[in-house]
Structures are given as C-alpha cells and as structure tokens.
C-alpha cells in the first residue's frame, strides 16, 4: 500500500528482515493497486541489488490504474514473477491482461514465452459461459471498471462489490435522515465520494493498517 508510513525505505527494511530470517522469495502484494510505480521499482532494485538470488513477485490490482506502469518498473528493476489475468476477468478491479503485459515486456527487450492464443480463447469462452450461467450473479458489473477515486482512499478493488452493496442498503435511510433535517439528498455517486473521503481521513487515525482483509473491511466500516 502507499501512505506516509508505507515508504520505499519501510518496505526495503522489511524485506531485509525477512531475508535475514531465511525467506527465499518476496512477493509485493499491492492489493489495492495504489503502490506508486517508481517506489515499487526502488524496492525491487534494492532487493535484487543486495540479494540477486531472491525471487521477487509482483501482485497488483488494476483498480486505480497504476498496475501496468508498476509492472514495467518492477520488471526493469529485476522482478521475476508477475500476476496477470485474462478476459473476461482481466482489467477492472482485477489484474492487467496477460496479452498486454506480454507485449509490453517484449517491447522492453525481455524474453517472454509466446501465448497459446487457441488455449487463451478457449479458456476465455469457458469462463464467459460460467459467468453467463451463474458466476455473473455474484459479480457487481461496476467491478469491470477502473476508478481513479481509489487512489486516495486506498481500498482494494476486491471489496468494491460488498462496499457498493452496503451503500445501496443504507442509501435510502441516509437520504430520509437528510430530508428530515431539511438538507439536500445525496445520489449514489455523491455518497460514494463522501465514503472514500472518510476512509482517507480515518485510515491514519486507525494506524494506517494495510488495507487488505480484514483491515480493509474494518476501516471501511468505521468510515
């Protein structure tokens, strides 16, 4: 994650401690996708410079829009493993698509295995059939979209479905209360922005916990 606490120095020191304890692989889990690309590159460069034998993996979600640039910075700094996705589940609040990342790495001169497009399309077809059959009922359609609003609040895209469902549940009650006070009612977008602002405000007051389960739900619920 990214905050006044979670700096490059903080993560570099943490990695050094883990390696000293015997870790052979370090995974940078950028669960909300708000890690700044240049900072991620600095972290990986430090690890690979001091410990070239350590395998470095990057896992970052696409919600706020940093992930493609982050993957490029991590790769250029010596990253080894990158978590990607494929259609129809790539992008949105998930991961960049393997095709895009593969072509980007090739353009930078990295050796990347060729994608079996026949297998890709078959897996794509099967996944879409599951979504059309039953899986789609459990996926909020707005999770298909990226949102720069997530940059400030730092919430992971994976919890957006439950967050939006929760807002729907309280929306009418909030507007009823506002109306009783003679105040203007809020539409869903206005309510969402206010919640994001409140998360951004309350997060440091709760100690800047990494916004991943269960802390992301806790911070969101307090907000």
Q: Which residue stretches match the model-derived regions?
A:
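Catalytic cores and adjacent flexible loops of soluble metabolic enzymes
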Residues: 1-223
